[in-house]
A protein has these predicted regions:
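Non-catalytic substrate-recognition and accessory regions of acyl/acetyltransferase enzymes
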Residues: 1-134, 142, 149-159, 167-169, ...
Length: 209
């Protein structure tokens, strides 16, 4: 399989400088190795510190139990499922998996095909909710941009849908997605969609950064 690689730029939070990165339209073994050998130890250290401080489980990172090896294995070889990864400084900085079989719920585009963003996660050291400044900023936005671009390529005109973990709700509102409320059929997670117009505005904003 040929992997398309695009050059993108992230922000080094400590220095304010741009960092060159790769946006890859696949999740390969190298990314899974990074998840296992780098993400997991970093996450474990965070969880141990949260436990030591007596932080309630409800405030722990809500994706801590995600297993990317299992997620990718489950859809391997299925053309309707795609993966994306962001690599910088020889490390995987973020991962995303999308599903091309879903349809829109937003009243203005109900029933039309969209790209469903099944999972999106940035490396533990890039998260905002760990009580320390992230190393790199822009990873999540880059993965959303990739999903919107795929939607456009597939003829879905940028339409995007997803269920958000509560800790990420504010991020999806910030990038202009429509909050369609809690979904009782999906663990009461809030369901967000990006319309054609919102996708255009989002991409224009990313290009101007």
């Amino acid at each position: 399989m040929t992997v398309d690689v695009s050059t993108i730029y992230l922000l080094d939070v400590a220095t304010g400088e741009s960092v060159e990165a790769e946006l890859r339209d696949a999740i390969e073994q190298a990314q899974l190795d990074d998840w296992q050998t780098k993400w997991q130890p970093a996450l474990l250290a965070v969880l141990q510190e949260l436990a030591r401080k007596g932080v309630p489980l409800s405030q722990w990172p809500q994706s801590w139990h995600w297993n990317w090896a299992q997620k990718t294995a489950k859809v391997q070889g299925l053309l309707a499922f795609r993966g994306f990864s962001v690599v910088a400084r020889r490390e995987t900085q973020g991962l995303a998996q999308v599903d091309l079989t879903k349809a829109s719920r937003e009243p203005g585009q109900a029933g039309k095909p969209l790209v469903y963003l099944d999972y999106l996660e940035v490396a533990p050291w890039n998260r905002l909710d760990f009580g320390v400044a992230p190393r790199l900023r822009g990873v999540g936005s880059a993965l959303v941009t990739a999903a919107v671009a795929l939607s456009d390529e597939e003829g879905f005109k940028g339409r995007l849908g997803l269920h958000s973990l509560p800790q990420a709700d504010a991020f999806y509102r910030k990038i202009g997605m429509t909050d369609l409320g809690q979904d009782p059929a999906y663990q009461n997670l809030r369901y967000f969609e990006m319309t054609v117009e919102q996708a255009r505005t989002f991409l224009e904003g990313e290009q101007d950064r």
